[in-house]
């Protein structure tokens, strides 16, 4: 009898120990997963690159210009690899009209882009903010039977060590393609 009672006590102790160890294991793995999820942060560049324009193309000229500004801000304000630069360049070209893309070879476009980015970084300018025309300020018109839109965007540039910003207003012209997507046809500095 004594031996059977001892065996029961040993079994109960082993089961309790297994439950305690199992609960400890569960808690230690649970908090590790939460910490991993919290520590993964998406950079501004990665966030911009994750947008799938084939499935979720911006529906209005203003939204197209907003996404263009987000990419442009990444070019001048963020750190990125050479591969990410190429991906950003490809992503921004998805917003361009075919006619604009046809003006330069891909190689020339990338070289000009790299030169422009290097110059801005050398001059120590970043894009502090940007302001896009209100939707009510978009001027719609037709040219050669195609719908177009004209709107303005002001980039507020900040020089390192400076407290103020310099405004650079640009006028954009967008044209609707055969799929109903607004594409950037061109832009130029606007008179302020």
Where are each of the predicted segments found?
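Amphipathic, hydrophobic N-terminal targeting peptides for secretion and organelle import
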Residues: 1-46
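Short, charged low-complexity linear motifs
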Residues: 9-10, 90, 94-95, 169
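Surface-exposed, charged secondary-structure patches
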Residues: 114-158
């Amino acid at each position: 009898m004594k031996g059977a009672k001892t065996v029961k006590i040993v079994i109960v102790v082993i089961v309790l120990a297994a439950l305690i160890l199992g609960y400890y294991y569960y808690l230690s793995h649970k908090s590790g997963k939460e910490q991993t999820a919290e520590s993964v942060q998406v950079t501004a560049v990665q966030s911009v690159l994750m947008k799938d324009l084939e499935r979720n193309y911006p529906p209005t000229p203003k939204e197209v210009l907003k996404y263009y500004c987000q990419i442009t801000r990444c070019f001048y304000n963020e750190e990125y690899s050479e591969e990410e630069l190429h991906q950003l360049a490809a992503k921004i070209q998805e917003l361009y009209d075919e006619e604009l893309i046809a003006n330069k070879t891909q190689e020339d476009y990338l070289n000009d882009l790299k030169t422009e980015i290097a110059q801005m970084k050398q001059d120590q300018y970043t894009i502090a903010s940007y302001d896009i025309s209100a939707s009510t300020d978009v001027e719609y018109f037709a040219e050669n039977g195609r719908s177009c839109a004209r709107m303005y965007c002001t980039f507020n540039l900040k020089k390192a060590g400076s407290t103020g910003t310099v405004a650079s207003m640009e006028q954009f012209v967008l044209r609707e393609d055969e799929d109903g997507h607004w594409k950037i046809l061109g832009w130029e500095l606007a008179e302020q």
